[in-house]
């Protein structure tokens, strides 16, 4: 059983998939940091000093009544919130990651090139008696007049 597991793991597809998952996770972390730490702060500054991660909607106030200055304050007093700013950050991260994967797949596809079309089926055959070329559907050779098998 250990030998079978070793063969399974050492197969090319499994190792490639493992590397892809590890690199994908690291790439996801980079994109998340890009969105939350690089893209969103300047965008919030342009809009008026807004931190998108602090966009939330209070469904139920916590032990201290609102309004709360930040999402962390609302969570600290146990308020129930819908955190749509964090969702917005995640949505932008997803869009960037999806676009990057699309561009990667598109470039890989263009490097491979188009597959060659299969060769067309022959429209002619050779007469077994006189070796002349005859149509594929012929039942009699026009050169030697031999009866052909179908």
Swiss-Prot record:
Keyword Transport: yes
Keywords: Cell inner membrane, Cell membrane, Ion channel, Ion transport, Membrane, Transmembrane, Transmembrane helix, Transport
A Pfam family it matches: MscL
Compartments where found: Cell inner membrane
UniProt keyword NADP present: no
Subunit details: Homopentamer.
HAMAP family, per the entry: MscL (MF_00115)
PANTHER family to which the protein is assigned, alphabetical: LARGE-CONDUCTANCE MECHANOSENSITIVE CHANNEL (PTHR30266:SF2), MECHANOSENSITIVE CHANNEL MSCL (PTHR30266)
Family membership: Belongs to the MscL family.
Descriptive protein name: Large-conductance mechanosensitive channel
Native species: Chlorobium limicola (strain DSM 245 / NBRC 103803 / 6330)
């Amino acid at each position: 059983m250990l030998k079978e597991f070793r063969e399974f793991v050492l197969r090319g597809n499994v190792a490639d998939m493992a590397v892809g998952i590890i690199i994908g996770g690291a790439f996801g972390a980079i994109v998340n940091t890009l969105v939350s730490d690089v893209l969103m702060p300047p965008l919030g500054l342009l809009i008026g000093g807004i931190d998108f991660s602090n966009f939330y909607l209070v469904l139920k106030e916590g032990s201290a009544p609102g309004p709360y200055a930040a999402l962390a304050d609302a969570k600290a007093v146990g308020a129930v919130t819908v955190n749509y700013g964090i969702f917005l950050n995640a949505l932008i991260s997803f869009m960037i990651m999806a676009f990057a994967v699309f561009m990667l797949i598109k470039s890989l596809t263009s490097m491979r090139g188009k597959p060659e079309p299969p060769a067309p089926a022959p429209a002619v055959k050779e007469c077994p008696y006189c070796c002349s070329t005859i149509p594929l559907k012929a039942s009699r050779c026009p050169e030697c007049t031999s009866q052909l098998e179908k």
